Amino acid sequence: MQRIVSICPSNTEILWALGLGENVVGVDDYSDWPQQVADLPRLGPDLEIDMDRVQALRPDWVLASLSVPGMEKNIEALEQTGIPFLVLYPGGLEDIPRDFLRVARFAGLEQRGRKLADRFKKRLETIRQKIPQDRPAPRVYWEWWPKPVFTPGKENWLTDVSRTVGAINIFGEEEGQTVQSDWRTVAERRPDYVFAVWTGVPMKKVRKDKMMNRPEWKDLPCIRENRVYILDEGWYCRPSQRILTGIEHLAHLLYPDRFAPSDPDNPL
């Protein structure tokens, strides 16, 4: 049986979706889904993986990622170990089913990857077909980090997620995966909704009251009308099958007359 190490949370989730969970022998500190990962050896934060611990697990291969700036040093360190590895670098939403197939091929399970990718695409299309076309497109601001402000740009899956639900990412025309900005610029772009998905931060630690009281935002209708939502970053910041749960939840927030609440236990 192949021994696999995953050093990124979204990769861990993809391995489980492909039925390779029993092959995983170690994960990064932030991998927390599904529940079975709780008992696996931890190898450090996803930006500071301990390669000595990786080598000690004697993996047949490592599933790495470049989904977050700074992960490049993990790749450089892996190259020094001589352990075979596969690197995922998801940009848009369409890269997620492609990554299913890439991982499956690397594991010698191409047919399984094709089936998973097809299911992902079909469910995504089902969501798209239910989005109302006769309403103004809501303008949304995604907050990945508050200070300094980081938000998804043009080449980011959350821009595609916004488009999927008939919305417009107010930074969606800015080049790059991630854009650095400030609260005043956000206010000038007049979002209809604010979605906070602070990377690596549990929902309970995100202070909505402080967001609502930012002086730069005091005149925004979305603040006055309480259209500020703290969302589960695991549904939006990880390019895996669970992003479908996030998309369905977003659609429910925007169109409650069309979409029921999403089912977190059935991502795909």
Where are these regions (language model features)?
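N-terminal ligand-binding lobe of clamshell/alpha-beta domains
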Residues: M1-L268
